[in-house]
Regions:
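Small-residue-enriched hydrophobic alpha-helices in membranes
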Residues: 1-29, 33-170
Length: 170
């Protein structure tokens, strides 16, 4: 521990709500850029309000949460975060984070390689297999595939095509 490390620490403990905010920031920044769609998705999860200047910012109730999460993400690695967060989360909270993380990743139309790696780290840290997560993933992929509206030749727009969800028995 260096002399000044005491000033770097996050004095508040990890909470599930904080883990949600931090996980979304880690996912958003995985590819080195914060896309507008990802910011919009973050605001939809954390809540937003008009700040009076014509732009929407994080609502007052969650501004402190987001500010704290931004500071945390700047100072900590995703591996350190996952080691700290995983033990305090319930199964439902882990899945909520994973679904929101993949939604953020796909909000701009595709999951970059770095975002795919990030999701893999989250799945592993949370003890959720790809097989178990697959149905959730498929729903979010469908939700974000807006090309079904703009491409009449999209394979899912063919006569007789029916969306099906495969649910594993894990």
């Amino acid at each position: 521990m260096g002399l000044f490390d005491m000033f770097k620490g996050d004095t508040e403990e990890m909470t599930p709500h904080f883990a949600l905010a931090a996980s979304l920031l880690f996912m958003m920044g995985a590819d080195g850029e914060y896309d507008n769609e990802e910011v919009g998705q973050l605001l939809s999860v954390l809540g937003g309000e008009d700040n009076g200047s014509g732009s929407i910012g994080v609502g007052a109730n969650n501004k402190a949460l987001l500010d704290r999460a931004v500071k945390y993400v700047r100072k900590n690695t995703v591996d350190a975060f996952l080691a700290e967060a995983a033990p305090i989360l319930t199964d439902a909270q882990k899945l909520c984070i994973l679904v929101n993380a993949i939604d953020s990743s796909l909000s701009d139309g595709q999951a970059e390689k770095e975002e795919q790696v990030m999701l893999g780290k989250m799945l592993t840290a949370f003890g959720i297999s790809e097989e178990r997560f697959k149905p959730f993933f498929e729903v979010i992929v469908l939700k974000n595939d807006r090309s079904v509206f703009t491409n009449k030749n999209h394979p899912k727009n063919k006569d007789g095509y029916e969306v099906k969800l495969e649910v594993s028995k894990v």
